[in-house]
Amino acid sequence: MQTPATVPRIFSQARRRSRWQRAAARQGTGHAAGFLFEILAEEIEDRLGFIRHEARTGLLIGDPSGQAASLLEPRIPHLERASPAVLDEEAVLPGRYDLLVSLGLLDTVNDVPGALLHIRHALEPDGLAILGLLGAGSLPALREALYLAEPDRPAARMHPMIDIRAAAALMQRAGFRRQVADHFPLKVRYGSFDRLVADLRDQGLTNALASAPPPLGKTALERARAAFLARADADGKVTETFELIVLTGWG
């Protein structure tokens, strides 16, 4: 694990917490998109059913939608919930657990190997970690639209993301006794650039880069909208891809 002084600061911890808090507030309205967390919650349920892992203590990190919490609370007598702050680079997780679940956060941690070590150390013997995140195959339509919005001076508006091979290697490097890395694409249809951006805000998936570029100007925003819709099918909708990675590891 790298020391705090040597970890590259790609992501802003403050911006990551802020986007999560905004997502939690939007989810509370009852009108926010939550499909990614719904699918991740289903993946957790499938794994727990298949593995038949009995847990008395658990920690759930993230999940602004509350969907995973609704699934886990009836199954785990002592379930704690935590904000993204517990996966900050200098943080040590607050206890030892039979089950630890993190959703939508690991891909915006500066020191991923260090975070995985903290997670493994927070597991009881034979404890289980299930970690859901967006993978490197995500959001190709959005990436292209943002690039074409500023063709002369493209800004870094999209995060670097972890691919499935790197994710599996990082789990092994962190010392999990056994590990499984799964990934699959989710295709979502959009009628506008703005609807996609709203869905990302609803689910806490917007920009958390430490060196954030200025907002798109009016002209650049119109270019982004046009470039996005240029990918539309005959029905006027664009297919966007979310690559979901689910990592399972035993302590």
Language model features by range: what are they?
Residues S65-I76:
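Conserved SAM-binding loop of SAM-dependent methyltransferases across substrates and taxa
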Residues E89-L100:
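A short acidic, Gly/Pro-enriched loop at the edge of an enzyme's catalytic core
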Residues S102-L105:
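A short beta-strand submotif of the Rossmann-like class I SAM-dependent methyltransferase core
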Residues G34-T57, Q67:
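Conserved alpha-helix/loop element of class I SAM-dependent methyltransferases that forms part
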Residues A32-A33, F184-G251:
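Conserved Class I S-adenosyl-L-methionine
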Residues P113-L128:
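A short glycine-rich, Lys/Arg-flanked "PGG" loop and its adjoining helix->strand segment in the class I
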Residues M1-E42:
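N-terminal, positively charged/glycine-rich alpha-helical extensions of SAM-dependent methyltransferases
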Residues I130-F193, T206-P214:
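Conserved catalytic/acceptor-binding region of the Class I
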